[in-house]
Each structure stands twice: as structure tokens, then as C-alpha cells.
């Protein structure tokens, strides 16, 4: 069972698709670096919808898998 996505992962999933549409030849490592920089530059208020969605996913995950324990 996978862990629920955090706010960055929720946001980056959307943004990664946009970058890949614009620059299909860009390497995944470069996309990841750009996403990290852009996330850090986002204002807290712009992150709120993604934080809320991540919390919703976390609560759903807890309900779906009540005995789940993260084991790396």
C-alpha cells in the first residue's frame, strides 16, 4: 500500500503534466528540480488548496487502511 500524497506531490502531479506537454524531451530529473524550486517560491496562500487536498487524501487513507504502518 502506498502512502498518501503530501501537498507537494498533489501539486507536482498537476504541474509535471504541464511541463511534459510543453517540453516532452526534458529529463525527469530536470523537471523534478524545477518543480522543487517553483514549490519553494509559491506563497503559502497558493499552497492551501494542495494542503487541503493532501489532508483529505490522508484522512481517506486512514479510513481505507486503519492498520497501515509506514515501513520504508
UniProtKB/Swiss-Prot annotation:
<dbReference type="GO" id="GO:0000978">
    <property type="term" value="F:RNA polymerase II cis-regulatory region sequence-specific DNA binding"/>
</dbReference>
<dbReference type="Pfam" id="PF00505">
    <property type="entry name" value="HMG_box"/>
</dbReference>
<protein>
    <recommendedName>
        <fullName>SRY-related protein AES1</fullName>
    </recommendedName>
</protein>
<dbReference type="GO" id="GO:0000122">
    <property type="term" value="P:negative regulation of transcription by RNA polymerase II"/>
</dbReference>
<dbReference type="GO" id="GO:0005634">
    <property type="term" value="C:nucleus"/>
</dbReference>
<feature type="DNA-binding region" description="HMG box">
    <location>
        <begin position="1"/>
        <end position="69"/>
    </location>
</feature>
<dbReference type="GO" id="GO:0001228">
    <property type="term" value="F:DNA-binding transcription activator activity, RNA polymerase II-specific"/>
</dbReference>
<dbReference type="GO" id="GO:0048593">
    <property type="term" value="P:camera-type eye morphogenesis"/>
</dbReference>
<dbReference type="InterPro" id="IPR050140">
    <property type="entry name" value="SRY-related_HMG-box_TF-like"/>
</dbReference>
<dbReference type="GO" id="GO:0030182">
    <property type="term" value="P:neuron differentiation"/>
</dbReference>
<dbReference type="InterPro" id="IPR036910">
    <property type="entry name" value="HMG_box_dom_sf"/>
</dbReference>
<dbReference type="InterPro" id="IPR009071">
    <property type="entry name" value="HMG_box_dom"/>
</dbReference>
<keyword id="KW-0539">Nucleus</keyword>
<keyword id="KW-0238">DNA-binding</keyword>
<dbReference type="GO" id="GO:0007420">
    <property type="term" value="P:brain development"/>
</dbReference>
